[in-house]
Amino acid sequence: MKKKMIFGMIIILITIAIIYITYTINNPKIAVLCYHNIGTQEEKKNVPQEQEWTIDIENFEEQLKMLKENNFKTLTLEEFGNWKQGKIKLPYKSVLITFDDGFLSNYKYAFQLLKKYDMHATVFLIGNYMQEKNEKWNGDLKTYISKETLQKAKEEYNNIEFASHSYALHEPGILKTKSYEELLKDEKDFKEKVIQTQVYCYPFGAYNDDMIKSLKESNYKMAFIFGPTKKEYRKASKKDDNYCIPRLNVSYGMKPSKLLIRLMLPF
C-alpha cells in the first residue's frame, strides 16, 4: 500500500513537472527587475523616506551572486526588444535589470558591482533632477546623477544603459494636468537636454492614452510600467503591449533565495 502511494506521488510530481516545462516553453516570459536606490545602513538612517526604496549594498551583491551562480543572463535593451518582437530567442533564465530615478548611489555602488559580475542594467533618468555637475559623494541618498557623471558613467561602464523617466513629469498626479502638446514637449526636452533614447519608464507608473500617443509620436519603441496593482507586478511576455511592459519590484530586504524562487515562477 505504501509503495503504491509513493509511486502515485512520483507520477503526480512528474506530471506537474511536465506541465510546468510545457507551459514555460510555450509561454516564454522575462522578468524585468525594478530597483531604485542602493546604500549602506547608515546612509538609510539619514534619509528615512528612502528606506523602503533602498537596497543594502550587501543584499544587492548577494542577489547578483545568486543570478551569476544560477546562470542567469542579464539583458541589454536591444536584446529585450528583439526578443519581444520575436526576432531572437533567449534562455529561460534571462532578466532585464532596471533602476528608476537615476540616483547617484547607482553610480557609487551598483555600477561597479554589476561590472564585477559582468551584468547589464538600464537606468531611467529624470531630466530636471540632474545638475550639470555633482559634488563628491556625501552619503545623501536623495542625490541624483549629474550630466557630468552621466558622461563619466557612459565612458567607464559599457554594461550600463540610460533611458527616460521623463524630463519634468516626476510628480504624483501631474499627468492629469498635462496636455498632449505638453507631453510632447517633455519628451523633446529629455532627448535634447539629456540623451537620445527610444525607451521610456512612466513616472510613478502613471500613463494614459495621450501619454502613449505622445511616446509613439516621439519615436519611443518601448515603455515600462510600475504597478499600480499586484497583477501588474509580473514577468513580461511577447504579447504585452510595447507601451505597457510590466516589471517586478525588488523590495527592500528581499533575500536572494526569495528572488530566485520568484524568477523561477512562470508568471
What would you call each of these model-derived segments?
Residues C34-I38, L125-N128, S164-L169:
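Short loop/turn segments at strand-loop or loop-helix junctions that form parts
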Residues N106-Y107, Q131-N134, H170-G173, N208-M211:
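Extracytoplasmic/secreted cell-surface and envelope-processing proteins
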Residues M9-A17:
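Core hydrophobic alpha-helical transmembrane segments of single-pass membrane proteins
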Residues K147-L150, K154-K185:
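Histidine/lysine/aspartate-rich catalytic loop segments that bind and position anionic ligands
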Residues T122-F124, E161-A163, C201, K221-F224:
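Structural detector of well-ordered beta-strand residues that form the stable sheet scaffold
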Residues I30, P48-K152, N159:
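Active-site beta->alpha N-cap acidic-glycine motif
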Residues K4-F7, Y20-I97, G173-F267:
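C-terminal active-site subregion of NodB/CE4 polysaccharide deacetylases
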Residues G102, Y167, P203-A206:
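Catalytic metal-binding/acid-base residues of hydrolase active sites
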